[in-house]
Structure formats: C-alpha cells, structure tokens
Amino acid sequence: MITPNVRRFLNLLCGEYSNQQQAFDNPPLYAHIFLRYRSLPQLKPGSILLEQTYAVDPKNPYRLRMIRAEEQPSGAIKLWNHTFQDPARFAGATFDPALRRSIQTPDLISLDQCHYQVVEQSDGYHGAMEPGCQCIVRRDGKDTVLVSSFHLQGESLQTLDRGHDPITNERCWGSVAGPFRFKRTQSWAADLASAWL
C-alpha cells in the first residue's frame, strides 16, 4: 500500500522523458538523453526502476537505479536510492516486462547517503538530496560529492547533477549551462493502476 500523495507523484513521474529539443538547440552543451521510470510492483510499495541512456546507445544504460518512494511524517516524500549488484544483467529492463519482474531485493545495493527528499509545491514537485547527505560519486579516478536536484511539473522534468570536490567544494563535473530539460514522450502511469493496492 502506498499513500495517495506517493501514488500521485509516481503517476506523474512514471514514463519516458527526452531532452531532444535541448540537445538539438545546444549540441556542444547537452547530449541527447532518455530517462525512463517504470514501476516494480514485485518489490516494496513505491519501488520504481530508473534507466538513463544516451539516444545514440539506448540499449546500454549509463545509469540504472531502483528508487523507492515513501511518504514521511512531514508529508515530504523520501526517495530511497539503490544501485544493482550486476547492472548489465538488467540493462533494457524498462522495455522488457519479464526482465523487470525478475528484479528482486537481493539484486539491489542501498546507496546510503544518496537518498532524496521531494516536496510538492504550487509549481510541481521539487526534489533534492536529503539535508546532510554526503553522496560520494567516483568520477575520473576522484571522489566527488554529488549535488543533485530535480523539478517535475506536468510533462516537464528538469534535472541538475554536479560533482564537487569534498575539500574545496570546486565543481569537478556536471552541467555548466544549467539544468537538463526533459519532456515526457510517453506515460506509464497505467502500470501503477494495480500496483501496491
């Protein structure tokens, strides 16, 4: 069972998103990326699969995560972030129902210190790393602290991920030109209709 607040959020989130227009308008600054969010009803309530791929290589995700949405006493939604023991095994699972159904809890690794907090405001849902989180991302042989946020409103999803030096706070990687701007190209909210009732 999930709360009405979480179900409303997931109904809006679940689908495929593309930043095609942004990538075409600014090819040096933005790669063309797909984000795909699909429910995983065999796991704990609120569990969804996130697959991120480059448009030029849609079958090989560069990021695969399981995120579990859970309402907190404050009314905010916590997104528990997990990676996979063997990500390659589940590559393409957003397109493959049998492969999605095969994902089980032992396949997952909790990314402690990398969970998100989502708050609904008048202009949609705003998510960011939980206060006090120190999510370490290793990039180019160096540990960096992830600073990540998103804004979901209607068919629009904006994301901004940057890695900072843990000592100097200097930006080491991530967008220099502002957030990635995605539009939903298809909704998979229907998948949620019978999930976690």
From Swiss-Prot:
InterPro entries: CpcT/CpeT (IPR010404), CpcT/CpeT_sf (IPR038672). It is an enzyme of class 4 (lyase). One of its GO terms (molecular function) is lyase activity. This is Chromophore lyase CpcT/CpeT. Belongs to the CpcT/CpeT biliprotein lyase family. The keyword Transferase does not apply. Its EC number is 4.-.-.-. PANTHER family: CHROMOPHORE LYASE CRL, CHLOROPLASTIC (PTHR35137:SF1). HAMAP family: Chrphore_lyase_CpxT.
